């Protein structure tokens, strides 16, 4: 199984650290969060089966926006990138399985888009992701509403959380990449220069609570990439 993943999957992990508290409330959508009680481990799906949410009880949120295969006729084809990020759903499910098996019944939150990226891309802003179609807009809203529910749960029960967005890159070097909202040119900077880029990174709050500098969090001996 591990060999299969090595040959077939190229992942970009986008780490978004969720800081909790009134001054730094994390938000993903202005849509109201459903007032529904969920059971950790359950999979909640909308009535069409287009968007799914595996309910969690940890400060870990995983999003899988680009591995859907459904192509409803009511959704016109989108313009722009539409490549499927194959196996990202499998990676999320395997992570959830092993995490649960080794943590005495704990679950990460996982949000799945089951619709083909050629029809819906919830990883973009709504105009580009749904492109004005009323049906696509509805599913886009459901995806982000589930995501907001997960964020609200993390904020309610934990001091901080982390969001892992599983997508695909097309680089010739087929390795797992960690995305921090920093460009390649940013990463070519010296440590002293890179330290000034903390605020624009998706892991700025990790750096804020770390005893290491921002540059060390990104590429030091104890950075996320060394785990």
Predicted segments, located by residue:
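Sec-dependent signal peptide recognition
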Residues: 4-12
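N-terminal Sec signal peptide cleavage junction
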Residues: 20-22
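N-terminal catalytic or cofactor-binding beta/alpha core of small enzyme domains
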Residues: 24-227
């Amino acid at each position: 199984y591990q060999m299969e993943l090595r040959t077939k999957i190229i992942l970009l992990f986008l780490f978004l650290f969720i800081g909790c508290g009134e001054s730094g409330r994390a938000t993903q959508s202005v849509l109201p969060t459903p007032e529904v009680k969920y059971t950790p481990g359950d999979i909640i799906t909308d009535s069409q089966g287009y968007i799914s949410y595996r309910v969690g009880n940890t400060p870990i949120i995983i999003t899988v926006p680009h591995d859907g295969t459904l192509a409803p006729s009511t959704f016109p084809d989108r313009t722009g990138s539409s490549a499927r990020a194959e196996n990202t759903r499998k990676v999320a499910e395997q992570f959830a399985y092993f995490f649960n098996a080794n943590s005495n019944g704990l679950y990460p939150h996982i949000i799945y888009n089951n619709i083909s990226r050629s029809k819906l891309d919830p990883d973009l802003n709504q105009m580009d992701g749904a492109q004005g179609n009323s049906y696509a807009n509805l599913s886009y809203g459901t995806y982000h509403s589930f995501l907001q529910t997960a964020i609200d749960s993390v904020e309610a029960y934990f001091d901080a959380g982390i969001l892992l967005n599983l997508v695909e890159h097309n680089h010739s070097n087929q390795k797992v990449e960690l995305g921090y909202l920093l460009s390649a040119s940013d990463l070519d900077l010296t440590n002293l220069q890179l330290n000034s880029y903390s605020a624009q990174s998706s892991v700025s709050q990790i750096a804020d609570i770390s005893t290491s500098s921002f540059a060390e969090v990104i590429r030091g001996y104890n950075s996320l990439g060394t785990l």
